[in-house]
């Protein structure tokens, strides 16, 4: 097969779409595809060499995408590589228009997709061009200023592209060199660098290259990940990178040392609620890991000699299992369900790769690490429990069903039986229908695994019949969802099973296995099943007849639910009949025929369902069925229409309608079988098409449509699960062997219906007989020669439309001359013709053209004479649509069928073996879809004059009087616009005519229609926004000018809304249009390689030299033209804006359009600059806002480039960098830090200083070339008025004009929305640009204003001055020393004034101002500012509030400087330390936050040296010594501090309490922000916190107690390193001996959270587990009742999440405690039941009972083997004294509650004697009184 094909093609295809080989015309496709490929290669190569990106290259790359959809990768490997290289060159053209880049990128992704087709030897692509492209778009320096407009989708397209590329082996090192210097954890560059690593680092390399691959970075990244404790945003990216690495290199990466840490972090990432009162750090929710990658990582680590991961995975599932129980719900549930659903799928994918996939160049998994059968079994076992629980989850059963489908593929014998155990009872129950829905949907997914049985699960098939029979009651008219799932269930099972009675084989054959004999005898029930199913359906139909269900008025449509039931019913019935043997079919046919012919149904609901069932029958075996139905119906109809008057009646007899309906459905069968009945059918059509009654003739039209369609279309006729059906005798063929058998793609034996000559003749005979006369009548009517009533016209149109629908596939498409001159191109833009199995007969009448001609005449006649005949217009619009596009199928039907095909495929696929092992019916469906797709692929059709006429008619309809007509016509118009090449350019001017202000004859309806035409629909073309200068230059000015049209009225809300939508859509969809269309030489060279390639040889060779020169000239001319068009568009919009009569709305729209036209590669024309600068002082706020953004962008355009030079850091520091990686503060980067003794304070120091502005350089490692700004002498001079360009002069003139500035500042200091305003970054950019470009030229004018604003404490004035100051400081980056010094001399006093006027509303703005001013600036340049802020933040002058604000502002500045100001941080800390005992809460909170930032730099990251900034450890030591009085004292700590500072110094203790309050604020603030937690230091504070934290939740507690509780909650969730755990446990043990029971109680709550959030890390050390266990068991015997109960709860939790195991030693320990003897009560103490102080014995006995109770409650959803005995032990204590009795009762009541649901299966675990006792206990009422 392959050989012959290679001979025809001349090459071996890379990978083609196999379904093409099964089409009825498959033998023609190789020639066709080679033709098209040669055409694509020739034209694409030529277009690239002629440098014609648009339309040439774009047109032919689109054709290439279409080729991929039609034939797959059907080209040679050489061509494949050439295409990829060419597209790679095109994608990475610098300055390429973004929409072109995206369209090339999507195609490139498609070409790179199947990794296995091209190895690294075949193809390597450089990574840098792609990185430059990605960087320029995702981190664009100009996008935020509005100089570039990118679509939202671009990010994902580029990411996918990067992931698909293959890079050379040297790339890893180059990437590390490029991005390592960005790894500064305090900076945003960290996120960027890790993001790049995740995206770009290659992980598929052969093992011998691993040293040049992941081994270069693995340890470094892994250590970084392990050492970060507080989940920064980039941690997720690292996880994604590790997951990809693991998946691509199974067996080559040793994960073992990290496994406990990995699983601990995965568990933390679910954010599950633990314990009683938990505070969640918000960052944990936003930055948690992506489940898809977690799943990939886990599934790649499983297996291997130790299989460590499986042990951890067991632990993971047992620790979260109970969260899956349906009674639990929360926002974490979605994540857990996703884990459940995806993990089995991921393992199946891995097994497929290891065992079944064809080997290719990618390194296979080494056999030591492949999953063994035991590994798979262990995996399935570990997932079974959670999945079975999740079946009934609140989120629905879909996730569980998908999980079970995959688990059943691997181990059917483990998962199917337990699901069956739940399914059978669910089928019996009447009260819980949701159980049925859930179990059936799970069974559907497992159907194939159940049926195929196999050696592991041979008893599977035996369940089929019992399941099918029991499912029948689910067909229930009263419960819709039950009905649907039952249909789906029955259909799924019957598709897989031939319904043939094989019982007779028991006598004939003696070689059957036991199982086969059982199935043979069971199959005798099939007939019974089919008949019972039919009875159920009949009952369903009877209960849904129309009369019962609704009023007369709503009769038109079935309700949505009814139509779904109809669909379910008909498809299930049709599946059943397809799978029946002939014997069973005949019985069923008889039954359905009798039902249909002995009753008369109304045609809307019941009638449709019955007719569907009859259609299903006749489709399966047409000959047998038609023999019954056709004569019956024809006789009935002939008989009923015998009377003359019938044809004129308005209402027809029900029986007549029903027979017509029945006939119209049963004729939807194989056309060949219809031919014997053709005379009868034609006779009926002649009788009924002219009936007066609309319902009557509509049914007749359906009959006409179906008869034509059955004979004219190409379609498969059988969908049986086995080719050839089941009619062979049992001796030679035993159907039970085919249960669950997949279709064999290579022997599908599809039976196609291809129209024979006889059928074709019949089709045209019908058209001549029935269509011709209608066309003639309509034509005479349209010419005014014959009167017709509207109803008659409509009836004729109905017949015409149904003829088109029926015979459309045989009528050749409309043809004629092409419309030329729309787009100049040097490349051939022809359409590709696809063969779809029909050879059009040119000798016959071309009805498509005839209909077209008549319809156009009729349309014009109706629009002239009776425009209100909307029904006829609707019909004509439908017909026009079909004339243009219909070749036998509709696009929307195709789309929904493709969707449902994918769904069915998913629900029944076998991902384990792969190889397209779908069932036969599905494969046939897919082949048919391939055929339909070929019919519908119409993009890039030539635009012919016929189409032009039809489009103009549609436009006329789209702007007609009635809105419904307009909207229907518009939808057809939009589809057409997307179909024909360049037709938009022809239509747009016609649409715009309606908006022309000079025209007075335009009605409001036409105006609105035209606007809708511009707007487009949500999926089609939007004429207002075609990415092309010609179109935009026409439409935008026209939209603005339409504001002057007489038809425009702003009083009509609908018109106002239309303009809003239009402007909004343009803004949303606009992408920067290219101006530069240069094609680089590399691409031209590759174009030449494509035209010179062979197999297939391109249609045309390399262009001649003169053509190439002409191409270059045209391309240069095109660039110039683009610039001119751009300038003209700007000019036109400005002209519109000059018009004084333009309404304000249109002025705003125009300014909006203008602001979209700012670009970073071409300066805005001067008049527009003038306009925007003037608009800064416009009256309307909207305009001012747009102007501010625009002027900021213009200033960026005018920014002059600064010269940069490389420097060598080692020369400056005089230190050579060490060989090994050393990050952090080291001698080599000390010169970057702030040293107050060596600041540049004079001109020469300043000039000699090497300033490094970006904060991250030098922290982690140095870049290959460190670029810094060249000395001032080499930089461009300041702007002088005589050297300015026109644009620069305009800005200069305005900003040196005092009146302009006056007005501007007045506007800027107005408030916009009260209380909502914030520091505005746009305004900041404006001022930054002014001071950057013009140095200090505008200061003299602005100074007086700034001084005035700073003195005014109003919110908006303060904000305004803050924005100016931030812009000024950042803008002064390159000023000379003299100017900078003068600037600070002015600013420092100004800022002092302003900061003393700070208010609640403005402190955030001042913080932003200073933070913005310090961002990415060398601290040594800002030393004036930093020193001013450091002066005295807590002077106390302005009261506590001003102090807090000063701190906030200072913090903003220092935080931006990160690690470069250790000296300032030390100074600040020593300044703050004595003030930590501050009284005021707001100052305390602020100090807490500032401390977090001071210690932020003290991180424990790998390869990082200890910081020079303050260390937490030393600070904590000092604090602890001050807190001594509290730690040592034993009495309760009360918050009894007097808030005013009393006279004299208070005692140490009061001071310590005040200090503690601040320290708590600091601990709370740092929990979510710092990277690493100083555990050893925090531990020393724990005893103190435990002492204070209250036990109950009560908001009335004072701040101190609440904070202490919060701190404990946050600390207990912290991630611990293994070496820290023993330290924590030691402290907890110590506190457990404390005298305060509150502290002992809190130890337990702390322990619960800490253990769960560090589960696997603690489990990996046996010693720690024993420590925890000892602690809990010790506290079980605490003297305080509350502590004992909490200990029991804790123990139960630890047992439940499998942290501790229930072993015999624990059981005997508790049983022994229970037997503690209690002292006898004395008789005379009857009054006092108990001594108030519990005796030691009572406590011990209670501890034992609590222990047993904890064990019982730790298994809420099942009954382990040890449980019955413990329940017996417990019951012995029912009559003990309190509190024991209470505990026992509570336990029993809980046990009853949690085990009640599944008591039937739990009962099995107990012996009869135990059950007697238990029933007594659980039922006797007194215990629950």
UniProtKB/Swiss-Prot annotation:
- Report the superkingdom from the record: Eukaryota
In which compartments does the protein localize? Cytoplasm, Cytosol; Nucleus; Nucleus speckle
CC per GO annotation: cytosol; nuclear speck; nucleus; spermatoproteasome complex
HEAT repeat coordinates: 458-502, 981-1020, 1162-1200, 1336-1374, 1618-1656, 1662-1700
UniProt region (Bromodomain-like (BRDL)), positions on chain: 1632-1720
> Which intervals of the chain form a coiled coil?
none
- Where does this protein chiefly localize? cytoplasm
Q: Does the keyword DNA-binding apply?
A: no
Q: Which GO terms describe its biological process?
A: DNA damage response; DNA repair; proteasomal ubiquitin-independent protein catabolic process; sperm DNA condensation
Q: Which InterPro entries match?
A: ARM-like, ARM-type_fold, Blm10_mid, HEAT_PSME4, PSME4, PSME4_C
What the entry lists under SUPFAM superfamilies is as follows: ARM repeat (SSF48371)
Mention one GO molecular function: proteasome binding
Pfam families, alphabetized: HEAT_PSME4, HEAT_PSME4_mid, PSME4_C
Keywords, alphabetical: Cytoplasm, DNA damage, DNA repair, Nucleus, Proteasome, Repeat
Entry keyword Transmembrane: no
Domain text: The bromodomain-like (BRDL) region specifically recognizes and binds acetylated histones.
Kindly state the subunit structure of this protein.
Homodimer. Interacts with the 20S and 26S proteasomes.
Q: Which family does it belong to?
A: Belongs to the BLM10 family.
Q: What does this protein do?
A: Associated component of the proteasome that specifically recognizes acetylated histones and promotes ATP- and ubiquitin-independent degradation of core histones during DNA damage response. Recognizes and binds acetylated histones via its bromodomain-like (BRDL) region and activates the proteasome by opening the gated channel for substrate entry. Binds to the core proteasome via its C-terminus, which occupies the same binding sites as the proteasomal ATPases, opening the closed structure of the proteasome via an active gating mechanism.
Q: What is this protein called?
A: Proteasome activator complex subunit 4B
Q: Which organism is the protein's source?
A: Danio rerio (Zebrafish)
Upper lineage: Eukaryota, Metazoa, Chordata, Craniata, Vertebrata
């Amino acid at each position: 097969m392959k050989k012959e094909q290679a001979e025809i093609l001349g090459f071996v295809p890379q990978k083609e779409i196999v379904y093409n080989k099964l089409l009825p015309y498959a033998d023609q496709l190789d020639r066709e595809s080679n033709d098209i490929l040669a055409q694509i290669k020739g034209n694409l190569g030529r277009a690239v060499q002629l440098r014609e990106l648009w339309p040439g290259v774009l047109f032919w790359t689109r054709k290439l995408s279409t080729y991929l959809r039609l034939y797959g990768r059907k080209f040679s490997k050489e061509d494949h590589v050439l295409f990829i290289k060419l597209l790679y060159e095109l994608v990475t053209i610098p300055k390429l228009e973004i929409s072109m880049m995206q369209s090339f990128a999507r195609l490139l992704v498609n070409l790179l997709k199947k990794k296995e087709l091209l190895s690294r030897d075949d193809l390597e692509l450089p990574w840098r061009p792609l990185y430059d492209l990605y960087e320029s778009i995702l981190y664009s320096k100009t996008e935020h200023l509005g100089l570039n407009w990118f679509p939202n989708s671009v990010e994902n397209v580029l990411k996918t592209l990067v992931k698909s590329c293959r890079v050379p082996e040297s790339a890893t090192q180059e990437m590390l060199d490029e991005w390592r210097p960005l790894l500064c954890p305090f900076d945003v560059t960290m996120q960027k660098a890790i993001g790049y690593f995740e995206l770009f680092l290659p992980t598929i390399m052969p093992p011998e290259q691993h040293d040049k691959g992941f081994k270069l970075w693995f340890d470094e990244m892994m250590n970084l990940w392990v050492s970060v404790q507080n989940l920064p945003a980039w941690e997720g990216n690292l996880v994604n990178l590790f997951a990809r690495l693991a998946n691509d290199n199974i067996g080559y990466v040793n994960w073992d040392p990290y496994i406990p840490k990995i699983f601990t972090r995965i568990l933390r990432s679910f954010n599950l609620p633990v314990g009683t009162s938990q505070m969640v750090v918000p960052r944990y929710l936003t930055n948690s890991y992506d489940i898809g990658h977690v799943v990939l990582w886990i599934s790649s680590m499983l297996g291997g000699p130790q299989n460590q991961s499986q042990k951890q995975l067991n632990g993971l599932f047992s620790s979260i299992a109970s969260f899956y129980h349906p009674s639990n719900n929360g926002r974490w549930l979605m994540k857990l369900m996703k884990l459940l659903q995806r993990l089995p799928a991921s393992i199946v994918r891995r097994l497929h790769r290891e065992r079944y996939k064809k080997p290719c160049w990618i390194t296979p998994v080494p056999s030591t690490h492949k999953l063994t059968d035991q590994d798979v079994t262990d995996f399935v076992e570990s997932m079974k429990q959670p999945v079975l629980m999740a079946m009934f989850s609140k989120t629905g059963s879909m996730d569980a069903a998908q999980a079970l489908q995959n688990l059943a593929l691997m181990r059917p014998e483990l998962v199917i039986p337990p699901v069956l155990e739940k399914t059978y009872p669910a089928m019996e129950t009447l009260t819980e229908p949701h159980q049925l829905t859930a179990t059936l949907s799970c069974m559907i997914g497992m159907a194939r695994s159940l049926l195929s049985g196999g050696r592991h699960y041979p008893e599977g098939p035996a369940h089929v019949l019992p399941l099918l029979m029991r499912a029948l009651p689910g067909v229930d008219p009263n419960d819709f969802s039950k009905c649907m799932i039952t249909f789906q269930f029955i259909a799924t099972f019957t598709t897989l099973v031939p319904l043939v009675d094989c019982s007779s084989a028991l006598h004939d054959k003696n070689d059957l296995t036991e199982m086969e004999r059982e199935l043979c005898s069971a199959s005798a029930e099939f007939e019974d099943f089919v008949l019972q199913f039919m009875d159920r359906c009949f009952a369903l139909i009877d209960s849904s007849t129309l009369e019962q269900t609704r009023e007369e008025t709503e009769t038109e449509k079935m309700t949505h639910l009814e139509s779904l039931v109809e669909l379910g019913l008909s498809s299930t019935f049709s599946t059943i009949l397809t799978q029946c043997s002939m014997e069973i079919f005949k019985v069923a046919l008889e039954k359905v025929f009798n039902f249909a012919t002995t009753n008369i149904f109304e045609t809307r609901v019941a009638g449709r369902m019955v007719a569907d069932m009859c259609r299903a029958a006749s489709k399966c075996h047409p000959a047998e069925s038609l023999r019954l139905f056709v004569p019956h119906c024809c006789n009935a109809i002939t008989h009923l229409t015998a009377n003359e008057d019938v044809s004129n009646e308005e209402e027809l007899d029900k029986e007549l309608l029903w027979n017509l309906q029945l006939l119209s459905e049963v004729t939807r069968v194989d056309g060949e079988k219809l031919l014997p009945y053709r005379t009868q059918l034609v006779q009926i059509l002649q009788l009924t098409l002219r009936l007066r009654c609309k319902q009557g003739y509509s049914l007749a039209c359906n009959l006409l449509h179906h008869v034509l369609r059955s004979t004219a279309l190409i379609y498969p006729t059988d969908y049986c699960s086995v080719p050839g059906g089941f009619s062979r005798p049992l001796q030679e063929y035993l159907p039970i062997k085919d249960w669950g058998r997949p279709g064999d793609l290579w022997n599908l034996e599809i039976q196609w219906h291809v129209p024979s000559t006889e059928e074709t003749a019949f089709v045209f005979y019908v058209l001549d007989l029935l269509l011709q006369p209608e066309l003639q009548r309509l034509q005479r009517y349209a010419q005014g020669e014959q009167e017709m009533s509207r109803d008659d016209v409509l009836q004729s149109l109905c017949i015409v439309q149904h003829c088109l629908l029926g015979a459309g596939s045989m009528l050749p498409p409309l043809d004629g001359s092409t419309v030329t001159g729309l787009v100049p191109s040097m490349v051939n833009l022809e359409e590709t013709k696809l063969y779809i199995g029909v050879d059009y007969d040119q000798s016959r009448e071309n009805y498509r053209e005839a209909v077209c001609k008549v319809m156009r005449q009729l349309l014009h006649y109706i629009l002239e004479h009776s425009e209100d005949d909307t029904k006829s217009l609707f019909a004509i619009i439908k017909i026009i649509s079909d004339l243009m596009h219909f070749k036998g199928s509709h696009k929307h039907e195709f789309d929904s069928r493709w969707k449902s095909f994918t769904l069915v495929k998913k629900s029944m696929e076998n991902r384990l073996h792969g190889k397209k092992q779908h069932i036969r019916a599905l494969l046939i469906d897919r082949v048919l879809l391939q055929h339909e797709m070929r019919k519908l692929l119409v993009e890039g059709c030539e635009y012919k004059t016929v189409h032009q006429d039809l489009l103009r008619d549609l436009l006329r309809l789209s702007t007609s009087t009635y809105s419904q007509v307009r909207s229907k016509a518009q939808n057809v118009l939009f589809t057409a616009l997307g179909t024909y090449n360049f037709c938009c350019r022809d239509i747009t001017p016609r649409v715009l005519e309606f908006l022309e202000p000079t025209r007075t004859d335009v009605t409001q309806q036409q105006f609105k229609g035209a606007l809708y035409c511009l707007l487009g629909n949500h999926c089609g073309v939007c004429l207002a926004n075609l990415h092309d200068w010609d179109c935009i230059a026409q439409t935008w000015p026209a939209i603005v000018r339409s504001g002057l049209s007489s038809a425009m009225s702003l009083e009509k809300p609908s018109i106002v809304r239309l303009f809003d939508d239009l402007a909004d859509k343009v803004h949303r969809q606009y992408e920067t249009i290219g101006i530069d269309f240069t094609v680089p030489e590399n691409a031209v060279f590759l174009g030449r390689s494509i035209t010179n390639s062979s197999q297939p040889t391109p249609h045309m060779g390399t262009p001649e030299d003169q053509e190439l020169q002409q191409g270059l000239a045209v391309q240069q001319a095109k660039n110039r033209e683009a610039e001119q068009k751009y300038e003209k568009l700007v000019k036109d919009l400005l002209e519109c804006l000059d018009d004084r009569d333009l309404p304000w709305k249109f002025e705003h729209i125009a300014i909006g359009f203008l602001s979209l036209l700012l670009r970073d590669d071409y300066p805005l024309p001067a008049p527009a600059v003038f306009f925007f600068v003037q608009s800064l002082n416009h009256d309307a706020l909207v305009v001012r806002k747009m102007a501010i953004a625009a002027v900021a962008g213009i200033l960026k355009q005018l920014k002059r480039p600064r010269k940069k030079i490389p420097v060598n850091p080692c020369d400056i520091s005089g230190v050579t960098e060490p060989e090994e990686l050393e990050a952090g503060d080291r001698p080599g980067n000390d010169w970057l830090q702030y040293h107050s003794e060596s600041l540049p304070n004079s001109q020469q120091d300043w000039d000699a200083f090497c300033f490094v502005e970006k904060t991250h350089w030098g922290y982690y490692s140095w870049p290959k070339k460190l670029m810094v700004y060249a000395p001032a002498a080499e930089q461009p001079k300041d702007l002088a008025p005589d050297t300015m360009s026109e644009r620069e002069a305009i800005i200069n003139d305005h900003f040196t004009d005092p009146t302009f500035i006056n007005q501007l500042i007045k506007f800027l200091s107005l408030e916009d929305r009260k209380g909502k305003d914030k520091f505005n970054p746009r305004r900041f950019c404006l001022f930054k640009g002014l001071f950057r470009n013009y140095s200090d030229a505008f200061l003299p004018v602005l100074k007086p204003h700034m001084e005035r604003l700073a003195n005014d404490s109003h919110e908006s004035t303060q904000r305004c001055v803050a924005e100016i100051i931030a812009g000024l400081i950042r803008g002064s980056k390159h000023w000379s020393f003299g100017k900078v010094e003068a600037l600070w001399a002015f600013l420092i006093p100004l800022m002092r004034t302003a900061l003393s006027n700070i208010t609640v509303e403005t402190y955030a703005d001042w913080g932003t101002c200073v933070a913005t001013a310090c961002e990415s600036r060398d601290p040594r340049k800002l030393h004036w500012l930093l020193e001013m802020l450091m002066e005295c933040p807590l002077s106390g002058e302005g009261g506590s509030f001003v102090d807090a604000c000063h701190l906030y502002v200072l913090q903003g500045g220092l935080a931006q400087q990160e690690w470069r100001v250790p000296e300032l941080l030390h100074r600040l800390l020593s300044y703050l330390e004595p003030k930590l005992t501050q009284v005021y809460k707001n100052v305390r909170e602020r100090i807490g936050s500032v401390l977090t930032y001071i210690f932020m730099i003290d991180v424990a990251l790998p390869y990082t040296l200890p910081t020079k900034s303050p260390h937490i450890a030393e600070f904590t030591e000092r604090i602890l010594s001050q807190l001594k009085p509290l730690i040592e004292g034993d009495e309760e700590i009360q918050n009894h501090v007097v808030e005013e500072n009393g006279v004299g110094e208070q005692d140490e203790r009061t001071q310590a309490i005040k200090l503690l309050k601040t320290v708590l604020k600091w601990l709370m603030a740092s929990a979510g922000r710092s990277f690493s937690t100083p555990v050893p230091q925090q531990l020393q504070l724990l005893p103190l916190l435990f002492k204070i934290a209250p036990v109950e939740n009560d908001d009335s507690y004072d701040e101190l107690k609440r904070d202490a509780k919060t701190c404990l909650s946050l600390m207990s969730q912290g991630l611990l390193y293994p070496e820290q755990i023993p330290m924590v446990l030691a402290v907890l043990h110590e506190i457990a001996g404390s005298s305060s029971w509150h502290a002992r109680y809190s130890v337990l709550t702390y322990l619960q959270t800490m253990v769960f959030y560090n589960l696997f890390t603690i489990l990996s050390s046996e010693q720690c587990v024993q420590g925890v266990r000892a602690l809990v068991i010790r506290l079980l015997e605490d003297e305080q009742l509350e502590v004992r109960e909490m200990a029991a709860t804790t123990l139960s939790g630890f047992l439940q999440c499998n942290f501790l195991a229930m072993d015999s030693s624990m059981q005997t320990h508790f049983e022994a405690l229970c037997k503690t003897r209690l002292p006898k009560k004395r008789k005379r103490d009857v009054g006092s039941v108990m001594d108030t102080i519990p005796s030691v014995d009572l406590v011990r006995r209670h501890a034992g009972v609590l222990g047993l109770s904890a064990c019982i409650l730790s298994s809420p959803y099942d009954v382990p083997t040890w449980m019955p005995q413990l329940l017996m032990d417990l019951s012995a204590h029912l009559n003990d004294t309190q509190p024991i009795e209470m505990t026992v009762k509570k336990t029993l009541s809980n046990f009853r509650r949690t085990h009640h649901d599944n008591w039937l299966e739990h009962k099995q675990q107990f012996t009869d004697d135990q059950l007697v006792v238990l029933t007594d206990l659980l039922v006797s009422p007194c215990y629950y009184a």
